[in-house]
Regions:
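Extracellular/surface recognition and adhesion modules
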Residues: 1, 6, 27, 34, ...
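Surface-exposed or flexible loop/turn and strand-edge residues in extracellular/cell-surface modules
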Residues: 24, 31, 55-59, 70, ...
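Tandem-repeat architecture and repeat-register "anchor" residues
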Residues: 32, 39, 71, 94, ...
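Short, solvent-exposed loop/linker segments at the N-terminal edge
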Residues: 46-56, 154-164, 270-280
């Protein structure tokens, strides 16, 4: 409030003035420090607004107890974009997370003052947040290791036939969201199970598929059994799709029975290879349509040790000296 009395040089007194013409007092005294009544933080992460990964947008909702000038806001120690809401008491600040921020709870700071220039106490803690949770940031992308694809084939677990059970196994360096572990084996969706729960270092997963005659084996030449693994960690960070084993060795599917394409049964008899006497050596040689396990061979009712020949497991030979 103010009051003005005045007199001109001749001694004439003017009417006292104590208000502005057509308005209120020009100066309003404000010595009250403003406060933040709401400081609420959330992420647009699909797995939960208290989680964040690179690319997520963090939103800080700010409400003051009186009009304030545009506040200065940092989120994750970075300058945030600030916009006014319905009035100068309501503000919003946003920041998009990058690979440069540190893992852990996302910090924030609000520096503000009211219209009179009274500085408020910088706000760094939640106030009236709906769930009371800070946002946890995780920029560590999950990675799979020890990825194996094996068959229950007792001779060679790198091969499968119709009826063979193929098992996909792998470890993760982070806890995975079960509903987001998506596995396909031989083009068929499979439900994984956890073989080892999180132990602070890793967790292990497995999925199986039983091969059938419905799968083409490329005319007996065999085909590599395909698989894919898609996965997301608890913070909603997706790992790179995996479609190969760690060793590069997978499973070959072959449902076609082998056949003998060439067979020779000869004696070293000096008169005729079709004749044999005691002491003569009879040799059996076979060539199959594909690589074989060691075949069982007998000559004249006697088991004979045979061996692969020609640098391939498709050709085998065995000999027996007649007695």
């Amino acid at each position: 409030a103010f009051n003005i009395t005045f007199t001109d040089l001749a001694g004439n007194s003017g009417a006292a003035v104590n208000s502005l013409t057509g308005g209120d007092d020009a100066v309003r005294i404000d010595k009250t420090i403003p406060t933040i009544t709401t400081a609420s933080i959330a992420s647009n992460n699909g797995s939960g607004d208290e989680l964040a990964v690179p690319g997520n947008i963090i939103t800080l909702t700010i409400v003051a107890n009186e009009d304030i000038v545009e506040p200065t806001v940092s989120i994750a120690t970075q300058s945030a974009t600030v916009s006014v809401g319905a009035d100068a008491q309501n503000w919003t600040a946003t920041y998009t997370m990058t690979e440069n921020e540190n893992n852990g709870t996302i910090p924030f700071s609000i520096t503000f003052s009211d219209s009179a220039g009274n500085d408020g106490v910088a706000q760094t803690a939640l106030v009236n947040d709906a769930d009371g949770n800070n946002v946890n940031y995780d920029k560590s992308q999950p990675v799979l290791s020890n990825v194996t694809l094996t068959s229950d084939n007792t001779f060679n677990n790198a091969y499968a036939k119709s009826g063979s059970v193929v098992t996909l196994a792998f470890d993760s360096n982070e806890q995975l969201l079960t509903s987001s572990v998506v596995i396909s084996i031989n083009g068929v969706s499979r439900t994984p199970s956890k073989a080892l729960s999180w132990n602070g270092v890793k967790e292990s997963w497995v999925a199986t598929y039983t091969m059938t005659n419905a799968t083409d084996d490329n005319g007996g030449a065999g085909i590599s059994v395909p698989f894919t693994v898609d996965y997301v960690d608890l913070n909603g960070y997706a790992g790179d799709q995996v479609d190969a084993t760690s060793s590069g060795v997978g499973v070959t599917f072959d449902k076609t029975a082998p056949s003998i394409t060439t067979l020779s049964y000869l004696s070293n008899n000096s008169n005729s290879t079709n004749m044999a006497k005691v002491g003569d050596v009879i040799t059996v040689s076979i060539e199959a349509s594909e690589d074989l396990q060691t075949p069982d061979l007998s000559i004249a009712g006697n088991d004979v040790a045979d061996e692969a020949a020609g640098g391939t497991n498709a050709i085998w030979t065995g000999s027996y000296a007649m007695q």
